A protein has these predicted regions:
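Interfacial loop-to-helix junctions that mark the boundaries of transmembrane helices
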Residues: 1, 21-26, 53-62, 75-92, ...
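Structural signature of hydrophobic alpha-helical transmembrane segments
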Residues: 1-8, 87-98, 140-148, 178, ...
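Membrane-interfacial loop-to-helix junctions in multi-pass transporters
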Residues: 1-4, 89-92, 119-133, 159-168, ...
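Intrinsically disordered, low-complexity non-transmembrane regions of multi-pass membrane transporters
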Residues: 4-8, 14, 44-78, 226-258, ...
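Juxtamembrane and boundary regions of transmembrane helices in multi-pass small-molecule transporters
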Residues: 4-6, 161-166, 170, 182-183, ...
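Short helix-coil transition sites and intra-membrane helix breaks within transmembrane domains
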Residues: 22-23, 103-113, 138-150, 179-187, ...
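Transmembrane helical segments that form the transport core of multi-pass membrane transport proteins
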Residues: 57-67, 87, 109, 113-118, ...
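Hydrophobic transmembrane alpha-helices that form the pore/transport pathway of multi-pass ion
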Residues: 126-181, 192-195
Length: 338
């Protein structure tokens, strides 16, 4: 049965890697692999428990004064094997949920509008490198998926040419993935390694610094040659914030510092308290939430906070990403227990 479960996991990885070909959502595949794997595990639980957890199972029987039956095995698996795996998965999911909510609060209050001001140029090279550098730096602090969606949405509203959009979009994707890979909070994979204690935040970043810079700079230099001297742009007037937020520049800057600075503080929080990183992320979220309530107090009292500017693709994509991470952690967990 171990071979069957392992085969399911391998097939799931293949389907995830070929998502563009199969058109099957990777989150659905991950959730299916995780749930089916655990169902098979508990159906043949006696073999796995006696081979991998015999001492723990014996102590469980002695403590609970139960006989070794299929029911007691299932109870042992659900309480002492399955729940710890769910706990590990929940830690990652809660961290992602907290950080993505932080991004939503910042985005709704216009804290990233400064990026549009930096992009006011007709030079294609300057536009390319500004997009790439800003995306790289933001993805270091936020997760790469959220950064990609946010920057692509912004770029799409500025550049009308389809061909130029493809080049700038590719640069954004490369920068977001390389920036996200540089820190433990930049992508789910690094977060899983850090949360499991396999790496430390400092060693992780220093080890990947040169590879990430090379993987980012070399493709961007090559893409630079594909652009004309001048870039075609169209600037849409910034939307009136009467129904969204009335924060001034300094209030937005303060919220940005609280959000981004708080995310940077999470590794320190983990090292000092030894508590799970998601608790630090929730702490940052709560502080930012309070600041948001204070700054928008008058607007909330007027019941005017009805329009949100977060792209729908981001909202739907966040749910998919969380389900995908949850499914993959459960799938890997069941293989680990076999």
């Amino acid at each position: 049965m171990t071979l069957v479960i392992l085969t399911i996991l391998i097939l799931a990885y293949v389907l995830i890697a070929t998502e563009n070909v199969t058109k099957v959502n990777r989150a659905a595949v991950a959730i299916f692999a995780g749930t089916v794997g655990w169902v098979l595990y508990i159906c043949f639980g006696m073999d796995f428990v006696t081979s991998e957890h015999s001492e723990d199972y014996t102590r469980f029987l002695n403590f609970s004064e139960m006989e070794s039956t299929s029911t007691s095995v299932k109870y042992f698996i659900s309480r002492h094997i399955f729940l710890p795996q769910v706990g590990r998965a929940a830690e990652i999911v809660m961290f992602l949920l907290a950080t993505m909510t932080i991004v939503e609060i910042l985005n709704n209050n216009g804290c990233f509008d400064f990026v549009r001001q930096l992009l006011r140029t007709r030079s294609s090279k300057k536009m390319l490198w500004t997009l790439a550098i800003v995306t790289f730096l933001i993805s270091i602090n936020l997760d790469n998926f959220t950064t990609t969606v946010m920057m692509l949405t912004m770029m799409h509203s500025i550049i009308p040419s389809r061909r130029q959009r493809m080049v700038y979009g590719s640069a954004i994707l490369v920068a977001a993935n390389c920036g996200g890979a540089l820190t433990v909070i930049g992508n789910p994979e690094g977060l899983v390694l850090w949360n499991s204690g396999a790496v430390t935040a400092t060693v992780f970043s220093f080890s990947l610094l040169l590879p990430c810079l090379a993987a980012w700079l070399i493709p961007t230099l090559l893409m630079q040659r594909m652009l004309p001297e001048r870039v075609e742009t169209e600037w849409i007037v910034m939307p009136f914030r009467g129904d969204d937020t009335r924060l001034n520049k300094w209030q937005r800057l303060l919220m940005l510092l609280v959000g981004i600075g708080g995310l940077w503080f999470i590794p320190t929080f983990h090292n000092i308290t030894k508590l799970s990183p998601f608790l630090g992320a929730l702490c940052v979220l709560s502080v930012l939430w309070i600041v948001n309530e204070i700054f928008n107090r008058k607007l909330m009292n007027m019941d005017a906070m009805v329009e949100r500017r977060t792209p729908r693709v981001l909202q739907y994509g966040v749910v998919q990403m969380i389900l995908f991470v949850m499914g993959m952690i459960l799938a890997v967990g069941v293989v680990k227990e076999t």
